[in-house]
Amino acid sequence: MKIYEGVRIMKKLWLLVLFALVLPLGSIMAQGEMVTELGDGEGALDIIAWPGYIERGDTDENYDWVTDFEAETGCIVNVKTAATSDEMVALMNEGVFDLVTASGDASLRLVYGGRVQPVNIDLVPSYSTVDERLQNAPWHTVDVDGDGTPEHYGVPYQWGPNVLMYNTEVFPEAPTSWSVVFEEQTLPDGDSNAGRIQAYDGPIHIADAANYLMFHNPELGITDPYSLNTDQFAAALDLLRQQRALVARYWHDAFVQMDDFTNEGIVASGSWPFQVNLLQAGGAPIASVFPEEGATGWADTTMMHVNAPHPNCSYLWLEHSISPKLQGDLAAWFGSVPAVPAACTGNELLTDAGCSINGFDNFEQIRFWRTPTEDCGDADDSTTCVPYREWVTNYIAVIGGR
């Protein structure tokens, strides 16, 4: 494994999509008209999704929430998986997809960039069953037109934390801190962590560093890992440069990360419950923990392209996506938390303990991904924070050794 592996390719990709990723929040493109009534399905549906989010039983026949939908609606589902939020934004700019399962660090870019349309929740009858903590969440409910009434730009799908995944043969007891991936140290097996850890291959990882500093360096005054002034941002970058000396590979592909834990000697990394579940199912000595510093996380929203070619099938899927059966099955498969609390009981795959295990009660402790902006979100108009475009360019520099 080499730290440089993939860096050159990812730098080229980021540079190609940088313009699309950093549209200023004020440059709103024309928004499409909200759909007011539905017609017959168009026969197809094209979705951009995280790996593991749209399953049709190919990996495990018990996990299939596509086949019955296709039979009932005639809408044939095509899925394009994306490994990062930046890739999702770039794909949505191509304009050939209907829906995207966007995390909070992509959703507002899509809204203010004019890439998604408001959703008429009256056409999604089960919307009222969505967790009240998510129904009007700021990463998808936005007053774009300034009329004082926020519009919904999607339907909540799943949420959860970014966990610390570790090898139980190296860590007989769960590590309590993210320090194992940020600070050089001797691990319980007697060897250094250098060359045995990973970090996420995306600019939003800067928030993980800021979250760590918020706990360990309170003198920096960080209160929100996504709203950083220049000094706080510089401190986070310094920590990431320190981390770079320890990193064997920056990961963005879930399946590559799983192979690295299985075959390449990686023993600790930030990860998703999806990888933890699959590795454990395969018998690997893997577990995960929610460290003392807390964690960043994701609350994903199914959003509809402003020029969706199959709007009727899109709305049929939006309703299907929040059915308790799908929500529970997906949570069991991915290790996430359902957006619909009713899915937490009576699901054979998830079990009645599943939501608690996956973090249902940790909502307030998770610092959910969102797009960093110059507006610090405070009452002081004189303060400015580092916007996402600078997160992108600086993270490229960090992993490139600068």
Residue ranges with predicted function:
Residues Q365-R402:
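Conserved C-terminal helix/tail region of periplasmic/extracytoplasmic solute-binding proteins
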Residues D98-A102, Y250, V267-W272, A287-S288:
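Paired acidic/hydrophobic, glycine-rich loop segments that form the ligand-binding mouth/hinge
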Residues S126-V130, A234-Q243, G282-V306, T351-D352:
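Periplasmic-binding protein-like
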Residues G32-L110:
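Early extracytoplasmic/lumenal segment of secretory-pathway proteins
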Residues D46-D60, G104-V256:
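Extracytoplasmic ligand-binding site segments that recognize negatively charged/polar headgroups
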Residues A106-V111, G270-P285:
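A ligand-binding cleft/hinge motif common to bilobed small-molecule-binding domains
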